Amino acid sequence: QGQALPSRRHHREGSLRAFSFSTTYPSNLCWAGICGVDENAAQTTESATATTTNTTTEAAKAEIKPAAGMQFEGVQPNEKDEVVVPAGYATSVLIAWGDPVYEDAPEFDPNNQTAEAAARQFGFNNDFAGLMEHPTDKDRMVYVCSHEYTTEPQMLPNYDPENPTDEQINIGIMGHGHTILEVSKDAKTGELKREFGPLNRRITGETEFKIVGPAAGHDLLKTSVDPTGTKVFGTFNNCAGGVTPWGTFLSGEENIDQYWANAAAVTGERPAADVKRFGVSEEASQRKWERLHDRFDLAKEPNEFNRFGYLVEINPYDPESVPVKHTALGRFKHEAGNVHVTEDGTVVCYSGDDARFEYIYKFVSSKKVKEGDVAHNMTILDEGTLYVANLEGNSPAGEITGDGDLPKDGDFDGTGKWIPLLTAHADGTAESHVDGFTGEEVAIYTRLAADEVGATKMDRPEDFEVNPVNGKLYMALTNNKYRGATGENEKKSQEDVTEYAPIRENKNGLVMELEDDYAGTEFTWNLLLVCGDPNAASTYFGGFPKEQVSPISCPDNLAFDSHGNLWISTDGNALGSNDGLYAVGLEGENRGQVICFLTVPYAAETCGPIVTDEVVMVNVQHPGETDEGTFEKPASHWPDGGDSVPRPAVAQVFRTDGQKIGMEKA
């Protein structure tokens, strides 16, 4: 997920049919990759709202012109090992895995990697991205991103998964974290160029973090290395996040289970239930880091795992600052962490728990924003109330068939309420709103606490953020093949279809639109998209004519352009087509119109979209990541070509004619 922050002051306020690749779609259409990885107060008028719900048969017969910001020729489906963009646009790489972040860092040599070098080079598998103002140089900006995870068999030569060397283990640890990078901009095209500047920084799996909020110092966070329970080294599996109005960024620790070993050694009912819920291996971990570092062995350090799974906050303008982990926001597989500031300065932070049948959360601060006071503002997320959502549909259960048929009222929609879990107070204490849990336990065992209050089970809630133009919330629900499953997966189904999850064995995902009262406890919701093949009866595109939309599946990260259009990046390629970035209209006759803007290289995921009037950026994650691909036999050669190993990288797209993104020529 990506965000641009051009000016801080503005932020106060069913199975798919397979198509052959010879199929050509209308110029505004494109095939979306299907997700192969299934685990891991608006200001619009009533009349505008009325026009966005359904489209008449007569309107469906005529092709509808794309909205401003979406006026480009859609990219056709492909399996090319490159970034494919519309005619009139060009693409380049800003930075790739291994490129130096510091001027004294070595150039990347894939055959001679070291942990020492990796700590000063661009990390692996960049995911979340943000583009922020430069504090002193009007000709530069600051690019920030997370490095979610490493894929050692494809990044390291002579790698044996069962017996990694000590150096290989440490290279992997250093490949995680974040990069902060100064960039300059071409005045004509908007293309960005990386620079060596004093703000450049790499945060790794060994960087010191401070634990803050109600769980800080609790016995469950104390280890032999840190008996205070307030200091932890590193951050792992940082997925989506968000830029804050006070000039920091948030990043969610997501699939942390893969780094730890020996869950079978964990004792106590609640701790054991927690590691099982996260999916920690009962024996050796995937990467075998526990062989070199005791902290990844639950048999030796049972509390180290409790120090991960939080939203972290980083100040990119102070390279010496210590990043923090916010325990008041709860501990789970955080996907996203997006902030909205109400008119009175209250901060609301939204986040999803990216796993099947998990929950969505928001945090409402008790402190107010103080403009220009970063030190104060970085404590805002330590005091306030954490909520989890409960959703209800407006239609009788019998009208939800599981096949995507709309209920009689014509919409998948309903209401919701936010249920309080804990309140963190100014004196450092935490008040629990869950019977049987202390406030500190709610902060650590958030999933288990949410179970107790009747939270709603969702289909892998990922990116979740407020549209700055219309004030509504949008959430990507990537998929859930176990929803209402039958046959071999029946035992894995925790819940049947419902109005908020109306597709049985949901392989293609949903996009939900919410109108929240922000600091309050009630909201309404509707499904904007039921993703998949528009020829399938199960799909729905906000009432837009199906024959004029791109098929889209497995929505993951979200962004918004200056016109208020929604942009969605996808994750997966089960039908063989490359992933992409899609623009979606939200208002009037364009509501639900989906057009493909780009596709990424073979077997890559599209992450961290940033959409400005001058440039579109995506993080190209894990190009060539297949079961067969290795360092010696790569499945992709992007971005360097030839016989090179693939490198995750930042791709940028810009106009060649100097016009604005998504606008017809003046």
PLM segments and residue spans:
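Conserved small-residue
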Residues: E13-L29, C35-E39, T49, T55-A666
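N-terminal secretory signal peptides
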Residues: Q1-L5, R9, E13-G14
